[in-house]
C-alpha cells in the first residue's frame, strides 16, 4: 500500500469544498490555510490538480463512465478522487502505475469499501487513455471535433464554437493552452507613500504601473496583495483599464471587487488627471470589498453604488437629485458580464457552467441592454467604453454593431482605442503600441490567449458621443 501524497489529498478536499459550497476552486485554494501549511511544491501540485480537474470535469467523466457499471450511483467524493487520477493520466501523463496507486489510496481515504472499484476502473483508464485522447473510439466523421474537445478539456459545443471563430487550425489549437496556468501580472499602487519591499526588487514596469510577468508563487508569498501595494490584473485587462482612464467624471459599470477601479485611479494619478470616479456593481458585498481595498491602499476619490445597470435611472436617483438633472459623465466604462471565454485558465469552471444559449442569446441581450441604458449617461464629447473578457463575436462586435444601429447608439462613433487620451502621453508609448497590435481595422481591441505564455482574451470598443 503506497502512502497518499498530501498534494492529492488537498486537491480532493478543495474540489469537494468548492462543489459543496458552489465556489470556484481557485477561491477555495486561496482561503485554505492548509494550502499554505504544506511544502510549496506540494501546494503548487495540489493547485494544478484542483484547477485542472475543475477545467476538464466533463471530459474526465466521459472517460470514467466508460468503465463504471452504474455511473450515477458513484458517491461524489469517490467520483472526484477518480477524476483526479484520470486527469493525471490524460493531461499530465503521469505513469499509470503511479496514478492508479495514488488514486486507489485517494478513494480509500474517504471510502474504504470503494477501493476495489477504484483499482479496477483506474487500471482500465490507464489501458485506454491513449485511444481516448486521440478519439479513436469515435466515428471518423466526428473525430476531429472530439479529439480537440478532449485535448482542450472543453464541452464539444464550446470547442465547435471556438473552431468556428478562428480561421486556421493553429488559431483553434491556441486554446489548448487553456489547461496551463495563466501568467501573472500586477499593477502597483501609485498612491504609495514609500517603496514596497517586493515591488522595489522587480525590473522596470512594462508600461507605467504594470509588471508582467511575475512569478506567481513568489509574488503571492510576498504579501504584496494583502497589503494592497498592488493588485493582480492581466496585462490585457490593464491595457483596457489604462486606455479608459480620462479626466473628469467617470461611471464604471460592473466594477466587481475593484481591480480596474484600482488601475484607473492609479493611472489617473500618474497622468495628473483631475477625476471623480463612481464604481457601480450589482452586489453590495463587492462594493464593500472595492472600498476596503482602496482605503487600505490610500486611494481616495471613489464612490461606490450598488444596483442594476439595466435600471440606471433608479440606481442614480441620489446623483440626479443632487444635481437637479440627470447626471452625465465624461466617461462611462462598462465591464460587461460575459462568457469569460478569454479567461478560462483563471476560472476553469466556466466551460462547464456555460450553455450555448448563454453565448448566443442571453448574454448578448443583457450586454446590449446595458449599453443602451448607459448611453443616456454619456456627456456630449464623452466616451462610452465597452469591454468583455470574451473571444466570441456574438458578445463583442455584434453587440457593438447592434447598439450603433439602435436609436440609443445613433449619436456614437467607434474610434480606435489606441487614440485614447492617456496613450498619447510619452510615458505610455509602449502601452499604445501594445494596444495597436491588438486592434483590428476598425480600432476594436481583441486579444486572444495565443499560447500557454500569453495573456487573456479581452475585447474593448471605444465609442465617442458626438
Please place each PLM-identified region on the residue numbering.
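S-adenosylmethionine
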Residues: 1-466
Amino acid at each position: 500500500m503506497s502512502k497518499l501524497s498530501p498534494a492529492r489529498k488537498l486537491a480532493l478536499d478543495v474540489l469537494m469544498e468548492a462543489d459543496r459550497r458552489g465556489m470556484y476552486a481557485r477561491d477555495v485554494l486561496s482561503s485554505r490555510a492548509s494550502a499554505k501549511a504544506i511544502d510549496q511544491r506540494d501546494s503548487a501540485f495540489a493547485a494544478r490538480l484542483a484547477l485542472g480537474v475543475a477545467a476538464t470535469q466533463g471530459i474526465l467523466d466521459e472517460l470514467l463512465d466508460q468503465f463504471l457499471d452504474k455511473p450515477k450511483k458513484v458517491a461524489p467524493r469517490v467520483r472526484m478522487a477518480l477524476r483526479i487520477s484520470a486527469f493525471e493520466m490524460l493531461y499530465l501523463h503521469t505513469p499509470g502505475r503511479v496514478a492508479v496507486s495514488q488514486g486507489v489510496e485517494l478513494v480509500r481515504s474517504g471510502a474504504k469499501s470503494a477501493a476495489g472499484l477504484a483499482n479496477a476502473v483506474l487500471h482500465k483508464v490507464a489501458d485506454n487513455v491513449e485511444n481516448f485522447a486521440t478519439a479513436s473510439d469515435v466515428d471518423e466523421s466526428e473525430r476531429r471535433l472530439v479529439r480537440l474537445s478532449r485535448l482542450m478539456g472543453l464541452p464539444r459545443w464550446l470547442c465547435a464554437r471556438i473552431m468556428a471563430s478562428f480561421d486556421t487550425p493553429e488559431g483553434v489549437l491556441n486554446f489548448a493552452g487553456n489547461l496551463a496556468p495563466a501568467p501573472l501580472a500586477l499593477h502597483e499602487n501609485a498612491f504609495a507613500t514609500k517603496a514596497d519591499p517586493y515591488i522595489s526588487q522587480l525590473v522596470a514596469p512594462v508600461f507605467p504601473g504594470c509588471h508582467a510577468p511575475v512569478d506567481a508563487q513568489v509574488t503571492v508569498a510576498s504579501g504584496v496583495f494583502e497589503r494592497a501595494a498592488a493588485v493582480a490584473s492581466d496585462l490585457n485587462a490593464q491595457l483596457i483599464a489604462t486606455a479608459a482612464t480620462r479626466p473628469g467624471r467617470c461611471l464604471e459599470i460592473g466594477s466587481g471587487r475593484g481591480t480596474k477601479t484600482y488601475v484607473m485611479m492609479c493611472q489617473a494619478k500618474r497622468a495628473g488627471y483631475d477625476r471623480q470616479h463612481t464604481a457601480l456593481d450589482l452586489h453590495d458585498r463587492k462594493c464593500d470589498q472595492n472600498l476596503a481595498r482602496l482605503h487600505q491602499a490610500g486611494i481616495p476619490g471613489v464612490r461606490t453604488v450598488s444596483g442594476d445597470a439595466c435600471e440606471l435611472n433608479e440606481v442614480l436617483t441620489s446623483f440626479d437629485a443632487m444635481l437637479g438633472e440627470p447626471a452625465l459623465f465624461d466617461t462611462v466604462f462598462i465591464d460587461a458580464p460575459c462568457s469569460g471565454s478569454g479567461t478560462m485558465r483563471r476560472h476553469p469552471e466556466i466551460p462547464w457552467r456555460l450553455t450555448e444559449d448563454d453565448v448566443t442569446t442571453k448574454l448578448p441581450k443583457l450586454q446590449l441592454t446595458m449599453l443602451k441604458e448607459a448611453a443616456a449617461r454619456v456627456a456630449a464629447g464623452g466616451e462610452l467604453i465597452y469591454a468583455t473578457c470574451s473571444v466570441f463575436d456574438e458578445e463583442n462586435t455584434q453587440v457593438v454593431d447592434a447598439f450603433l444601429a439602435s436609436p440609443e447608439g445613433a449619436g456614437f462613433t467607434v474610434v480606435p482605442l489606441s487614440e485614447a487620451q492617456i496613450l498619447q502621453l510619452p510615458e505610455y508609448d509602449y502601452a499604445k503600441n501594445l494596444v495597436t497590435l491588438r486592434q483590428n481595422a476598425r480600432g476594436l481591441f481583441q486579444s486572444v490567449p495565443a499560447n500557454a505564455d500569453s495573456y487573456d482574451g479581452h475585447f474593448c470598443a471605444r465609442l465617442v458621443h458626438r
